[in-house]
Amino acid sequence: SRGLGDVYKRQAQTIDIVPTLAEFFQIAPPEYMDGHSLTPVIRNDTPIRDYALFGIFGGHICITDGRYVYMRSCKDPENQPLYEYTAMPCHMDRPFSREEMSEAELCDKNAFNFMKKSGVFKVPVHHSTDSYRFGTMLFDLLTDPEQKCPIHDSNIEDHLCQAMKKMMKDNQAPKEQFERIGLTE
């Protein structure tokens, strides 16, 4: 039986937390919600997803199947095109500058389903995390759980790259994200 402090080794994403809480409190999640309840994992270790997509804004876009972690970097040092999409033009600690807003454009209201036809700004970003200097990396969590020694396996990389493209499409990643990391949509 599972208890406090147990570790679950199934793929999950942050977006799975709200559906889990909604199920616990017997609230129907909105139809546009992409996450999955973690209840099957918690109750009987049943997987809810084959892959987890993650990353950092403007940095690596990553995917894992639980065994391997594939970290795709930007294709060139300029790390472009890169845009911030926001309904609230603020950074964590300050509002966007006049210069930033002068380059902003209002997106098509149908650009993202989850915005429910609300407008969002598309703001060019000219500085970000430098994933290029690290390059694209592949790790085997079975032999290298601390991800210290990247491996090279084109078959695994191709497989995870295809899964990454599918998940990016499913999550409505803007088309320029594919271009930024050198993938065709």
Q: What kind of region is each of these model predictions?
A:
Residues K9-D65:
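Polar, surface-exposed loop/tail segments
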Residues F57-H152:
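C-terminal, low-complexity/hydrophilic appendages and adjacent surface loops
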Residues A12-P19, H36, R133-T136, P145, ...:
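A structural signal for well-ordered alpha-helical segments within the folded catalytic domains
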